[in-house]
Amino acid sequence: MVVHVSNPVARLTRTQVSQIFLRKALLWDNRQPVLPVDQAPDSPVRRSFTKEVHRRTVASVQTYWQQETFAGRGVAPPERTSDANVLAYIRRFPNAIGYVHADARLGNDIKVVIVTP
């Protein structure tokens, strides 16, 4: 998981990350809105993230979001087509959180958040 360097979060549990990306957790501890950003549905990193964090398939999470949207309860996080686009989103919106490939070049304005079981 990656966030803007100004974000005070350093560690999250897998459950917290899942809640953030399913928009069940809406605020950081500092009361600022959490802005999750997903990768494209066909991205290998998205498939891996979804399996590890949500314990579901991408299709299952997409179905969840279709139901939530139809019921008027929320909309899915925005999707970006590459690591570079996820990082650009986080740079633009310091309250954002996303995920990228392990070998992505982060730069000094992005930091890694440790995810624990």
Say what each PLM segment does.
Residues 1-117:
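Exported/periplasmic ABC-transporter solute-binding proteins
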